[in-house]
Amino acid sequence: MSTNGTATETGTAEAPALGEELITRGRTITESDLVSFSSLTGDWHPQHADAEWAAAGRFGERVAHGMMVLSYAVGLVPFDPERVVALRGLDSVSFKRPVAIGDTIRVHTRVDSVRPLDDEHSLVSFAWRVLNQHDRVVARVRVDALWRGATADEPETEIVPNTVLL
């Protein structure tokens, strides 16, 4: 992830700036993606795998698995392995709209809080909105990452949202 932090001689980096935002490149969802994800997970629900069944349903066509969309979002967000130690959690996951074959998704991410844990690490919380090619939100999630670089003597900072990400 692009950050304002810089590497130091010890190999650590500052935590990202509060409020920092990034919009990723896009990725178009293909039929092969649906088949591959179904094969990997064993989720062959007809909404994803049966064109005739899906055509008669709520969305009128096959749509991507919600977890596939979330997994691809993780792959779209660039994280520096020298800074990001581990994914610590996902919270407030919601799937707002279907993603169909041929849709292109991208991720808008914002740093919402930085909480120093010790002399070398912080817990950084990101608000992610997964958008389609029409800039409509298809999914939202709060992502917590263990970040190398901030120190415990730095104050905890947080953005207190006055609205829910839509």
Annotate each PLM feature.
Residues 82-103, 107-109:
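Mid-chain, well-packed structural core segment of small domains
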